[in-house]
Amino acid sequence: MVHSQLVPTDIRFGRLLLTGAAGALGKELRGRLASYCDTLRLSDIADMGSHAPHEELRPARLENAMEVDQIMDGVDAVVHLGGVPTEREWEPILQSNIVGAYNLYEAARKHGVRRVVFASTSHVTGFYRQDEQIDAAMPVRPDGLYGLSKAFGEDLARLYFDRYGIESVCIRIGAPSERPVTRRHLAMWLSHDDLERLVVCALTAPSVGHTVIYGVSDNLATWWN
């Protein structure tokens, strides 16, 4: 289902690429991003179901440079949610999140893509104490291999901006859900509507360079500034 726009904008993309389209956030953004582009290209290794007339399904393994290069052809901008989404053993994280991130940015460079929205995580700063309020300018302190891989992705995005001019917004996503389900979630909650607003603003803001932000709603209590 195509949702109506929450973010009024005159910018309309010809073709957007959404990786990780079969995941929980990918499924949520699939209907929401459709109204901001003519064609929404969806990619994942898992089943993405049937496609609507405005959609293209392009399965690809992030660790396979040729497959990633193919899904990048003709794309105007990328929302990169793909990869291993939680703590795992080293090898799948290495292949999907580190090699995969490199393949994605290299393909973006080759195809002239100028904007990437990179799904990072609060786990890149997971070893700060909960009584410390932190911001995106503070040094990373990953709490595991997953957080480490996303810290690499943020630095990779910095390299590709400094060296090639590809702009990125790296969103350290908190706890996205329709509503908070625990007291702990109240400090990290990101509503689905705010997720849409954040991603669309990251895609359409006139100049973002290399930006790292925390993705969280305007909650009464939060760990992040």
Question: What residue spans do the PLM features occupy?
Answer:
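N-terminal Rossmann NAD(P)H-binding glycine-rich loop of SDR-like oxidoreductase domains
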Residues: 8, 13-36
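Conserved glycine-rich Rossmann-like NAD(P)H-binding loop of the short-chain dehydrogenase/reductase
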Residues: 36-49
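SDR active-site strand-loop-helix element
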Residues: 19, 43, 78-81, 116-122, ...
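Glycine-rich NAD(P)-binding loop of the Rossmann-fold in SDR/ketoreductase-type enzymes
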Residues: 63, 92-103, 111, 122, ...
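Conserved Rossmann-fold NAD(P)-dependent oxidoreductase catalytic core, especially the SDR/UDP-sugar
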Residues: 103-141
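Catalytic helix-loop patch of NAD(P)-dependent Rossmann-fold dehydrogenases
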Residues: 95, 129-168
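Alpha-helical substrate-binding/gating segment
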Residues: 172-179, 189-211, 218
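NAD(P)H-binding glycine-rich loop region in Rossmannoid oxidoreductase-like domains
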Residues: 49, 55-96
